[in-house]
Amino acid sequence: MIIHNLGIKDYTEIWEQMKEFTAIRDSNSYDELWLLEHYPVYTQGQAGKPEHVLNPNSIKIVQSDRGGQVTYHGPGQLVAYVLMDIRRRNLGIRTLVAKLEEILISVLEHYRIPANIRSGAPGVYVGEKKIASIGLRVKNGCTYHGIALNVNMDLSPFLGINPCGFAKMEMTQMSHFHPNIQLEEVSQHLVQYFLTQFK
């Protein structure tokens, strides 16, 4: 597993790089985890519906090829893209999603933030509020896209959409519990728990 820390990047640029990496990889290619933040952007998943974008203002909307519905990415949100050969690892997509949820819950528990999952609504929640999203694409047995964890960001753009297709879905973030939390530190813990699950 190769870990890349990419800083803050344009969504479309990284999306193209993920598709290119997945297209040219072979059975000997290492799996990779890309850690980054994005400039403000709304992304529509394959199941996304235009009516779930309520008020985009000046934020760009990108029609993506990941699973799921609409979400928002912006600075202060930790994004981890999972470029993994799940066929080689004998992993089903549902098992992978469950493991990613476990990793996110472990990170949050490290900070004593009580997290949970909800049946039929992938992602991780604190009470009824969503703190992390998951959206993947599988091509030729390999995944790309991944997870987004709200660390210390401006949550107001989420008010312009129905996050993940749920009207009135409230969002939260780690800084509500730890005002001085640093994204870089959270990223280190996420990598630690990720490598515990996936050697």
Swiss-Prot record:
Family per similarity comment: Belongs to the LipB family.
UniProt EC number: 2.3.1.181
HAMAP family recorded: LipB
Cited Gene3D superfamilies: Bira Bifunctional Protein, Domain 2
Keywords from the UniProt entry: Acyltransferase, Cytoplasm, Transferase
Function comment: Catalyzes the transfer of endogenously produced octanoic acid from octanoyl-acyl-carrier-protein onto the lipoyl domains of lipoate-dependent enzymes. Lipoyl-ACP can also act as a substrate although octanoyl-ACP is likely to be the physiological substrate.
UniProt GO molecular function: lipoyl(octanoyl) transferase activity
Protein name: Octanoyltransferase
GO CC terms, sorted: cytoplasm
Residues annotated for substrate binding in this entry: R66, G67, G68, Q69, V70, T71, Y72, H73, S133, I134, G135, G146, I147, A148
Pathway(s) per entry: Protein modification; protein lipoylation via endogenous pathway; protein N(6)-(lipoyl)lysine from octanoyl-[acyl-carrier-protein]: step 1/2
